């Protein structure tokens, strides 16, 4: 799939006999300093859910869900749907801190009977005009698997058990089980009384959101025992659920020892500042504009923090085979509008390196994201929604996630050799190889010779995102970073522009 809409057959016809007969020298003939060599043997399955997005009503802090909803027509804004289809998230998660005081029944049924709620974390009142049914409808329209985060007894946070006016906001296993029935039980009376005859299938559920982050809340053992109670109640409503438990802050080992038989995934989050231990970071506030070269250097090293975080989680789970679910993740930098540097293309290139880290750990990491989904202000958003008018557009992180999502294989393969300056991962589906290539040089292109161990190539094409790393994607100029599609030359040589992110598709003979 690609944005030009051309099929593989049309492409091959367009490039003609030259591409069809394309033969790239075998790997042994391309061992120079500029060689990019791939071992095509499959290593492990790559999950499609490495491209998840995360939707949370953020109240007065950021427009998010309220900005994406058309209150006049009681539907999602068409421009939000359109741009999300281009982003093509494989999974969409509803929840976050909001889940700790969310009572789902207030947001279903007739609109004039829905009960507004105090958004205690993010400020203001949420109208609850967007609830379970609307969220599932959004997921259907953009072809994303829905994931719901339950109210896990307010995650043990006393300050969220009641709102300032005394309304009880905590909910237990029975309410979670009723939610499962509302979604999945063909005979659920409440849903049918709302005029919805057929189920709204919801197979993925997370129990606990950042439960370990609060002081004077649940400890790990208490959370694990409550996780079991929730899991049993929810599975009594539907035995075919996929459940994710909370395991961050050193909880993973104990959580899995106590509750692991009830869980399919263990979750953690990573909202991070790679320069948090450094004074005078160029990534804070608007400092990034003063010294672009220094900013670039810091952004290109940010992947190390992501690598360390995932490795730490793998150490926590040890030999337990339960896969990891990174259900929230993004840069968290101080400054106006939350991480302003993230509007720059330089940050897009940095996020591509983080995606490559995810793929390298794809044997254990099976769910991941790199952004909040949508909003009007925060630069950590994947989709920016102009208000009061204008068309929604993809931020740099979304452009990279979209590129990878549309050009990725099902199985990881090994990158044997790369030229200096390139960060490369590779995958495969059948007779097609996919390379994700990041040029980490700010001002220098990198020329390379592509080769595959023991194979020739039938055809190749390159999908390339490139632009000035200092360019900032804002509502007035959302198209400053362009996506181009090009045929790979018959000699297999290619030059990756400075500060570029590319997806390379290589067709290999099956015989």
Model-found features: residue ranges?
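Aromatic/acidic polysaccharide-binding cleft in carbohydrate-active enzymes
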Residues: 324-400, 412-423
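Tight coil/turn sites that cap or link beta-strands
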Residues: 497-501
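Acidic, Ser/Thr/Pro-rich beta/coil linker or hinge segments at domain junctions
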Residues: 455-496
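Active-site flanking residues adjacent to catalytic metal/cofactor-binding acidic residues
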Residues: 209, 327, 438
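Noncatalytic carbohydrate-binding groove/subsite architecture in carbohydrate-active enzymes
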Residues: 220-352
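N-terminal export signals
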Residues: 4, 10-29
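N-terminal catalytic cores of secreted or lumenal carbohydrate-active enzymes
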Residues: 32-264, 268-280
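Carbohydrate-binding surface patches
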Residues: 421-456, 462, 502-505
């Amino acid at each position: 799939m690609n944005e030009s809409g051309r099929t593989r057959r049309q492409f091959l016809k367009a490039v003609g006999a030259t591409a069809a007969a394309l033969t790239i020298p075998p790997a042994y003939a391309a061992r120079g300093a500029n060689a990019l060599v791939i071992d095509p043997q499959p290593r492990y399955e790559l999950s499609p859910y490495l491209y998840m997005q995360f939707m949370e009503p953020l109240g007065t802090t950021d427009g998010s869900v309220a900005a994406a909803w058309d209150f006049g027509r009681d539907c999602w804004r068409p421009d939000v749907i359109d741009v999300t289809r281009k982003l093509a998230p494989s999974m969409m998660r509803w929840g976050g801190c909001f889940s700790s005081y969310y009572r789902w029944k207030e947001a279903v049924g007739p609109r004039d009977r829905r009960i507004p709620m105090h958004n205690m974390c993010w400020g203001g009142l949420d109208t609850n005009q967007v609830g379970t049914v609307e969220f599932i409808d959004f997921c259907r329209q953009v072809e994303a698997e829905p994931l719901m985060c339950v109210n896990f007894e307010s995650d043990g946070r006393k300050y969220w058990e009641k709102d300032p006016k005394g309304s009880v906001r905590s909910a237990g296993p029975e309410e979670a089980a009723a939610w499962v029935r509302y979604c999945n039980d063909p005979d659920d009376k409440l849903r049918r009384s709302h005029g919805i005859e057929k189920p709204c299938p919801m197979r993925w559920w997370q129990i606990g959101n950042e439960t370990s982050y609060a002081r004077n809340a649940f400890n790990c053992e208490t959370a694990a025992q409550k996780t079991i109670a929730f899991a049993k109640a929810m599975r009594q409503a539907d035995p075919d659920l996929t459940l994710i438990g909370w395991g961050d802050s050193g909880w993973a080992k104990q959580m899995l020892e106590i509750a692991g038989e009830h869980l399919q995934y263990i979750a953690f989050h990573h909202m991070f500042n790679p320069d948090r231990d450094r004074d005078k970071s160029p990534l804070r506030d608007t400092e990034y504009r003063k010294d672009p070269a220094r900013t670039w250097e810091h952004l290109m090293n940010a992947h190390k923090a992501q690598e360390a975080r995932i490795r730490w989680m793998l150490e926590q789970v040890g030999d337990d085979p339960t896969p990891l679910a990174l259900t929230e993740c993004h840069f968290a930098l101080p400054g106006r509008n939350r991480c302003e540097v993230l509007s720059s293309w330089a940050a897009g290139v940095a996020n591509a390196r983080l995606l490559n880290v995810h793929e390298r750990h794809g044997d254990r990491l099976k769910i991941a994201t790199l952004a909040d989904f949508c909003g009007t202000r925060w630069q950590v958003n994947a989709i920016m929604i102009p208000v009061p008018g204008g068309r929604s557009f993809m931020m740099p992180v979304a452009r990279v996630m979209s590129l990878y999502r549309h050009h990725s294989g099902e199985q990881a393969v090994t990158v044997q050799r790369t030229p200096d300056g390139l960060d490369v991962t590779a995958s495969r589906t059948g007779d097609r190889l996919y390379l994700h290539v990041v040029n980490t040089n700010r001002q220098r292109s990198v020329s390379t010779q592509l080769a595959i161990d023991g194979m020739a190539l039938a055809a190749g094409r390159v999908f390339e995102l490139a632009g000035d790393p200092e360019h900032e994607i804002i509502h007035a100029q959302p198209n400053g970073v362009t996506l181009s599609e090009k045929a790979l030359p018959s000699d297999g040589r290619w030059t990756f522009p400075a500060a570029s992110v590319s997806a390379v598709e290589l067709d290999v003979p099956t015989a």
